[in-house]
Amino acid sequence: MYFIFGNLTPRFALKPVSLKVQKNESRDKKLKERWETLLVVLNERFSDGEVIDVEGVLYLVGLQELGQVHRKMKKDDNVNLIHIGICSVLEPYGYYRFDFFDDDGWPHFELLEELPALKAGEQSILMKEALVEYFLKRQLIQ
């Protein structure tokens, strides 16, 4: 099996984290720095000139979790990869739980709790925070 982020297994135990989106300047500054570092690392590895956005990072996480990086993907597969990315990064927050791999090797998740209604800015912060945590746990960034 080949993984896009090195010799990492796609699934391993993650500690639960809190969803609370807090207004804390030093925390926000640290998140911004880590997010920008993550984008630099991912853009250097995977971009052909276009800047990777949140959706692109979720796609890469989905691809990593699927573990089938050389497989030719269909349009529907791309949407499913983003969904896998969302489930994977929000799993430590208690919203999803990995359930099983299907016969084609695709991971399936169980929805444990509906996501709260968040404003667009809060959604963006949550996803960036969850993505940064995902890559911190995998030691791609510090």
Where do the language-model regions lie?
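N-terminal amphipathic/basic-hydrophobic helices that include classical n-h-c signal peptides
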Residues: 1-22
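Ser/Thr/Pro-rich, acidic low-complexity intrinsically disordered regulatory segments
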Residues: 25-29, 34-40, 68, 125
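Intrinsic, low-complexity terminal and presequence regions
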Residues: 21-27, 56-59, 114-117
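Amphipathic alpha-helical interaction surfaces
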Residues: 67, 88-96, 133, 137
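Short runs of predominantly hydrophobic/aromatic residues within well-ordered alpha helices
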Residues: 35, 51-57, 78-83, 123-128
